């Protein structure tokens, strides 16, 4: 039986490719998709979810828009990374359907209530919507199998020296998620920076030759340009968000450790930092499965294989 998942995302190039991968995988049953503000404004990330589902001919999937800002802070967006639309690069179709007439939290709650088995929440943006769900519906915690997030790192940052972007946008929300008691799986920069897509991988995807693989290649063309900055020291572009889906499909591609994780919400230099107790110094019981390594070639091969689904 396919694993039921609920995807909360802020497309964003890598979020879009995570959607592509999830919907090409019969092992997963995507029950709903909710959008969060993050990589772009809430209006644009919602539109991008609708555009991607229109492209993939999956307008049957319920979609809802989430919180317009973080729990306690002003919104920060990553338009310098993802462009004015949030998905700059390819010519994507305009949406042919509308979102549900409800909030993201309402759609999440409805999805959990209606599911006959616990649902895995995959969150590839800031954790605002998930935190609001957890706070407003404690009775539904038992309906959540796990929360798989793209966010954080062990002592590494890509937005500040200490913080990864998704966690930095709403650290209070991330702290709620990590301390919820629900199993959390963390795909942080330690693993996603190893999941780099190279130029030759992009050409491999393009050569598959179907409309979706072509769009994915064009998304990566744009994404690669940003990551050419020598400050990163990258060969290609880290494909952050699809690591969450890839872990669900092929966990054997990833090396993980069980550790306690907390989120710094007040530090002068470290707001948004995920504090990973790697050496068990706090005495706290592990609350997260933390990805630390990936078989890069296996990851690329998985994506290439699933792109053929859209032929």
Curated annotation (Swiss-Prot):
This is Pyrimidine-specific ribonucleoside hydrolase RihA. GO terms for molecular function: purine nucleosidase activity; uridine nucleosidase activity. Its EC number is 3.2.-.-. Belongs to the IUNH family. RihA subfamily. One of its GO terms (biological process) is nucleobase-containing small molecule interconversion. Pfam families: IU_nuc_hydro (PF01156). The active site is at residue 240. Keywords: Glycosidase, Hydrolase. PANTHER family: INOSINE-URIDINE PREFERRING NUCLEOSIDE HYDROLASE, URIDINE NUCLEOSIDASE. It comes from the Bacteria. Hydrolyzes with equal efficiency cytidine or uridine to ribose and cytosine or uracil, respectively. GO terms for cellular component: cytosol. The gene is rihA. HAMAP family: Pyrim_hydro_RihA (MF_01431). It comes from Escherichia coli O81 (strain ED1a).
